[in-house]
């Protein structure tokens, strides 16, 4: 979804369409810069939704190919 970037009191601002608006109780956000990309998330909640979300299925990596144990010199 595209939107507009504009100047407000000599600072950049982004107009969020209703479809992607933040909840009304969000008063502060964090902006994470990844190259030219900007990720806007409610302040203090950056990883909460990720960890609270669905976890992997019970059979995740059941058939993982793992190399055998290596013999190493002790120090």
Curated annotation (Swiss-Prot):
The keyword DNA repair does not apply. One of its GO terms (molecular function) is DNA binding. Signal peptide: none annotated. Keywords: DNA-binding, Plasmid. Residues 3-45 form the SpoVT-AbrB domain. Belongs to the VapB family. NCBIfam families: TA_anti_VapB. PANTHER family: ANTITOXIN VAPB1. This is Uncharacterized protein in traD-traI intergenic region. It comes from Escherichia coli (strain K12). The lineage of its organism: Bacteria, Pseudomonadati, Pseudomonadota, Gammaproteobacteria, Enterobacterales.
């Amino acid at each position: 979804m595209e939107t507009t970037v504009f100047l407000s009191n000599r600072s950049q601002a982004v107009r969020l369409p209703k479809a992607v608006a933040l909840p009304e109780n969000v008063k502060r956000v964090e902006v994470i810069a990844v190259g030219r990309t900007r990720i806007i998330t409610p302040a203090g909640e950056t990883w909460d939704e990720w960890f609270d979300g669905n976890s992997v299925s019970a059979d995740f990596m059941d058939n993982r190919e793992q190399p055998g144990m290596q013999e190493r010199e002790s120090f």
